[in-house]
Amino acid sequence: MIIINKRNLFFLISVWLLSTLLSAQNVTISTPHTQLLLSVPNGGTPEQLYYGSRTSDADIRSICETARRRNAYPVYGMGYPCETALSVRHADGNLTLQMAVIGVKETRLTKENATLTVIELKDKVYPFFVNICYKAWQDADVIETWTEIRHEEKKPVQLQQFASAYLPVRRGNVWLSHLSGAWANEGQLCQEALQPGMKVIKNTDGVRNSQSAHAEVMFSLDGKPQENTGRVIGAALCYSGNYKLRIDTQEDDWHHFLAGINEENSWYNLKKEEVFRTPALALTYSDEGMSGCSRKFHQWARLHKLANGNTPRKILLNSWEGVYFDINEQGMDQMMGDIAAMGGELFVMDDGWFGDKYPRKNDSYALGDWTVDKTKLPGGLQSLLDNARKHGIRFGIWLEPEMANTKSELYEKHPEWIIKAPEREVVCARGGTQVVLDLSNPQVQDFIVQTVDELMNSYPDIDYIKWDANMSIITQGSQYLTKDNQSHLNIEYHRGFENVCRRIRASYPQLTIQACASGGGRVNYGVLPYFDEFWTSDNTDALQRIYIQWGTSYFFPAIGMGAHISASPNHQTSRSVPLKFRIDVAMSGRLGMEIQPKNMTEEEKALCRNAIAEYKTIRPVVQFGDIYRLLSPYDKQGAASLMYVSPEKDKAVFYWWKTEHFCNRHLPRVKMAGLAPDKYYKVHELNRIDTEPLKFEGKSFSGAYLNDNGLEIPSTHRVEPSKQNEYASRVLYLEEVTPSFSDNRIEQRPPLRVLCLGNSITRHEYKADIEWFSEWGMAASKEENDYCHQLEKMLSQNRPGTVVTPLNIAYWERNLNCSIDSLIGAHTTDKDVIVIRLGENVQDKEAFKSDILRLVEYCKRKANKVVITGCFWKDDEKERAIINAAHMYGLTYIPIDWIDRLYDSRPKVGDTLYDIHGKPYTVTKDFIIAHPDDKGMKKIAEAIYRVL
């Protein structure tokens, strides 16, 4: 029995009250590996205490007691000595703010796998309110923060400065890394030690915002930036319009970082009860250098900030540098046939295909008139789509929907739709006639959406749109906005643009859309939720692309980075670069081609055909792997190198390019990174042109050795004298193996006992009423062709005796929360591997989110290795639940919904299958044709095999 006297009772109550007070005054915002700590006293000022790696509860308590505090969102006018985040002019003319905490709310965003924390502030005198919002992702180490501003004053309040966020960075030897550039020279890396004074990075283009500078930065906290060591804070403003990043360094101990919309000439008149939401600033932190910071941005992008971020991107040919405006039906058909013959998967017809009254013969005509030029394409788009289908590839098309020419039917009909200053003449740009449509006008927004709707409704087989934007807002004024709100144009344009994008993406979620804006003018996280990829630069010169793509990779993943093989001499730089080098550079992003194939030799086509086949092998690693930058071209050491490593660390792709050409130049040996030290990797060179293989071809090395030493890369190619030149490049594919230490050859491995948990795709019993007369994976023509049997055959090549057992547990999908042990327990005995391939039959998606975790946890206890695939039928909500389960339990996640989009992988009514007795029968039921055919089954098996 515990006896509590009055003194003890007083002490316990005091401790409880103090604990409650501390809890009420402090807010912890966490991702899996990072943490932001705030002090939010009721009636007081919100303050930042800590941002960095995730720490313990004990440390949090100590931080709260000892940390130096900085205002979490500094406002103007009441004594704050540095740059402020928010300044306003109240309805009565007062310029000051004094914000105090009035509440804190936390909400679990289950569908997004995130937590939203809102700190509510109110001015101490005026009915003026600010919400500071923090969205912490639970499957990625990113915290997004923004503000929501409103008031209840009688008249509008003018917002004069309205940053999204403020972050104090402790002074020391802090370096800033950011990107600058120009057309055809985007993404140039700039690094500098922060000095006293004001550093400003801003954009005023109005339409594009990532050509001359970028709205993303990194702060290296331990001195000169290192790629794979050191503490780094990354920040990315998720906005498509004009922005301003400020770093104010005064006499105190902090660099004051503020980011948000560029307020210059964009002051905003906020009406009563209107909510002004600033764009989000995404923050991440890594103690593994700049590459570590990049890996966190890339993972977050693929999961949440890039449309269809888990879907492999197709290999395409774009017509632009091949024919420019000289488009015709026969030429397009020939280009489609050529790329199909080389193994490509998509053809994109670029500018020049449209215009009736004003044919698009150059860039002076027809923007806005999105009708086919029948003189160029007498069969219309349908003929091109039919030809693409004939060649076995998909078809895409170019649009510039935000623009018009004064020589267009659209302009003649709606001159009031363009951006034009009141009482001023029209100002044109590109081609002498190009103008920008005013997207603040809802009618213009409707027109753009209708343009895409008409195109997609008429031609639903269109697979890809290249969305271009080749002009700035060079005349400040709107014919739609009122005279009092002319300063809203730059903000309202991008609100309108986002509204257009949101509507289009909602209607066509699977349509691939590329963000192009005179090249890399729209590489930002404001637009990428609506776009699948971006055109990195109009400059396709391979040597310069190394620098452009290197810089871009700091914030954006390879899956979104359009990288094309183009002609030599290059059309932008006139530089002659050998095809091997051009291929090796393009293969480090989303591979494509921008060339006229009929001008290529048969030898060149064969080299490209081989490269495309090689890229299909490494595509999962490049597009979904973790980046490690190894040797920077900006360090001027004569070479550049980076690599991608699969999340499971069982595969990697290593790139090396010689960037400078001097006689007797000694190039550094490059250490690799990211490989598992205890694993062994077999080395295979891709795109080889040398007459002899590399000395390490086919050899295996430990990850520890490669991380510590790398390999000696020859700086020249052994080729015929007539083919020798100053360029050299290598692409190495590394696969995990079990080595024989005696002769460096791969031993045969012991057999595996694999259990595949699935549904009808895994195995379906004989069922006459649906005309399924077999007992294997549904829609496979024969037992040996379903994915389980194909997987067993693949594994048995170097693991003789392997047995793959299929188990249909569709019952679990339809009856979540049932007993897992009674359902599968007896089948899990002595299993080495369990493959979870489920989800298509799930109806209760909310229950699925928790029960898939339960299933994974059970399987982890039963087998040495567990892998999990996504769904064959695409469902983003289910896919997120599966990805979350994989991340939480450290499983290998295998996406497979791309199979049906990249390949014609379902049977058709009329196809022949075989029953359990080997007799043929004809498919008649829609239920069966929803399942993968033999080809689809093989792709599923291959995807799992690559992991196992």
Predicted regions and their residues:
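Short Pro-Gly-centered flexible turn/kink motifs
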Residues: 33, 95-101, 268-287, 727-735
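Active-site neighborhood of glycoside hydrolase catalytic domains
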Residues: 373-380, 412-414, 418-580, 588-604
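C-terminal beta-sandwich/jelly-roll accessory domains of carbohydrate-active enzymes
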Residues: 660-741
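Carbohydrate-binding surface patches
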Residues: 33, 217-219, 227, 633-677
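Catalytic His-Asp segment of secreted/periplasmic serine-dependent ester chemistry enzymes
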Residues: 871-948
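Polysaccharide-binding surfaces and accessory modules of carbohydrate-active proteins
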Residues: 25-38, 44-248, 264, 680-696
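Aromatic-lined carbohydrate-binding/catalytic grooves of carbohydrate-active enzymes
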Residues: 308-450, 459, 464, 849-852
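Conserved SGNH/GDSL esterase-like catalytic core that processes O-acyl groups on lipids
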Residues: 747-755, 762-849
